[in-house]
Amino acid sequence: MSSPVVRNRNEQAPGFYRVRVGDLEVAALYDGTLGFDPHWLNGPKATMDAVVNALHEDPHMLDVADKAFLVNTGKQVILVDVGAGTWWGGGTMGRLAGNLRSAGYTPEEVDIVLATHPHSDHIGGLTTQDGQRVFPNAEVYVAKADSDFWLSAEVAANAPKGAQPFFESAQAIAAPYVKAGKWHTFTGSEIVVDGMQLVPLPGHTPAHTGYEFSSNGEKILFFGDVIHALRAQLPHPEVTAIFDIDQTVAAATRNQLLSKLANENVLIAGPHMNFPALGHLRKEGNGYCWAPVVFTDQWDKR
């Protein structure tokens, strides 16, 4: 009698999904899932009570996925954000490199990393805990005001105690790229990548930045942390998160951007939207709803 086959039934399918945007190949790459306490969101009590009551899951801890995005222009392989790696999530993160390989790429092939901001759930995948560069050939780009803020020892020393880990992780993650001359900053007027426009989206961090790629009349916007919790912040765009460094500006940025996107045919890539985190926005009541892309195995023939 043969031995029973031991199967791992705890894993899901590989975490990558491709779409075509003009001549660009775009792939969402799953890094893992974070626990998100609804109390990290700020809004009127009645609004927050309604949000929590409407959830079809544990109202005390939401699951929020974290993604990175690959853009293959035909000339360059680009990542927009790189997930958390081992810097956040207590072991639930760090799947980016494996999913990148499953999608047919290696870390060595990545030419450019565009960081929407230097929080560890967006740049943690750059660096191992022992200070090794995960993407040895990549040039990393981040807004200068964000880099100056999060990498400043002086700003860190004067920051609230609860914010210290954000500074410590940003500085440790950036260090090997700074040392190698591969950490670059922009002020907003430079051409970092052909066919890509910098989109200032301040509030979450001082210079939180989106990246809009255009190709053959089609567009995709990578909008970073404009949305943390879609089930709360799409119907109620005024709801902010405790991680927003300027909550008034963050709410204003979100309201302005969501209104614009709902009226335009721009594909959106949001790292904390439900996987594959690609879709469009539609106006719904006083807020918005998310229209995700429809799964297809014919990604390059759509």
Describe the predicted segments one by one.
Residues 1-15, 296-302:
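Basic/polar N-terminal segments that are highly enriched at the extreme N-terminus
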Residues 12-103, 210-226:
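Conserved beta-strand hairpin/beta-sheet module of binuclear metal-dependent hydrolase folds
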Residues 31-32, 82-85, 118, 145-146, ...:
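Active-site metal-binding loops of divalent metal-dependent hydrolases
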Residues 65-68, 74, 90-141:
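Active-site metal-binding motif and surrounding structural segment of the metallo-beta-lactamase
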Residues 78-80, 114, 140, 220-222, ...:
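Residue-level marker for buried hydrophobic side chains located in beta-strands
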Residues 94, 216-302:
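Cap/insert and terminal regions of metallo-dependent hydrolase folds
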Residues 101-105, 109, 139-200, 249-256, ...:
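Metallo-beta-lactamase
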Residues 113-123, 201-208, 269-276:
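Histidine-centered catalytic micro-motifs
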